[in-house]
Amino acid sequence: MFDCCRVPGPGLDWSVSHAKQGENGRSGHVVVFHRGRVWKLEPWQDGKLLSLDELQRQIQHIYDNTTKEYPGVGVLTASNRDIWAKDFQTLAADPQNAKILSTIHSAAFALCLDTESAPSFISHSRLLWHGAIVPHADGVRPQLGLRNRWMDKPLQFVVSADGKAGLVGEHSVMDGTPTATMCDRVLDLIASPTFAAESNSPLYANHRGSLPIPLDWSVGAATHAAMDSASDAALALINSQALNVVRTPYGKAAVKAFGVSPDGWSQMIIQLAYARLLKAKGWRRNGGTYEAASVRKFLKGRTEAIRVVSEQSDRWVASMNDPQADTKKRVSLLKDAVKTHGAYARAAGNGRGVDRHLLGLKMLVKEGEQMPAMFTDPVVKRSAYWVLSTSAIYTKNFGPYGWGEVVPDGFGVAYVAGFDDFLQFTVTSRTEMPNDEFCEELQRAAKDMYDLFADQVRKAKL
């Protein structure tokens, strides 16, 4: 999570860690990006963390001394990985640039101070996801917020011009749960009424320390051309993506009162909505639904796949679209589906899933060797074609969060089931996919499911 970075290579990336054995966190540096310029900030002085006032002074120094735009080399990190690997070698061939790269790689994390605002839920989400897009007055290549990012860093904290903040996480060596926990702990500290006073106490370095150091790239013609190409490719990718957020008028409190797991309930909303979307479009389901399970209780454990679709979930979905099925039957089938989902989730969390095992076997096949027939079987391939890539993280401080779809004709669905008064779904897809219609179906499915139990409650009161 800290003091490390993803590094591009020909055909293969790797992760470098600069964390020292026995490190207690009382040293190191942070990199700050503003208007494309890179700064090295040392938050520790003489073994003490800088006071809040001193940190503010240092960040103000960065603002005051970055009044123009600098070459946005960071956009290269959003390129196709093989292209970035080639551009990385060109960039690193210059000794000055090599030192900057080393400073970025070894930083605890990156702080990105954007010049663009995020007035809405969606604009804030997109600013975090891929940066803002600012058209040029002369109609040429727009300015991308990606110039102010380093997408290979595991942690990038982004602050927009209107003071909204968020996190961009690099997923290859890190998962969402520990980062969400970290954010909650940090924000709890900041929310404390004694935070400001304590952060300026003698426990912190209040004297004026060394100011942040600007790290300016040496950018030749080849890198300038690479930045233009990277910007064009990034803009095309950004414009190909749709994003919407759905919030229901009820949340965990109501679902638990119905005697149903909020996570299982949320997954069934997704299943019902997707089935109705397919029916409306005349499409056939051609893949599975992935939900992430944590296996962090095992040594080096990360995630396992919960295969959400089951015979029970399909039977329940069919009942919801069958006018002959009564409420009692639908409720019974829903509870069976949620019970099955819970069993699948527990099995995956206990290391009894199948997907990571199959991945391990697949990775044992050496280059040039024939892939075993099992992995080319159409049913096996279709079962792992994740048309719905879903996961749930609960944090009391996040608004929307999410990721892109994992297959061209699929959806990414990040949901939150931990709030008492609403459930939230962040839905991403290619723009050619019916994202708006899927979100409408999510809202309809959520209402129909609520009405099943609300009807029961009304009858019980009578």
Where are these regions (language model features)?
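Acyl-CoA-dependent O-acyltransferases
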Residues: 1-156, 161-462
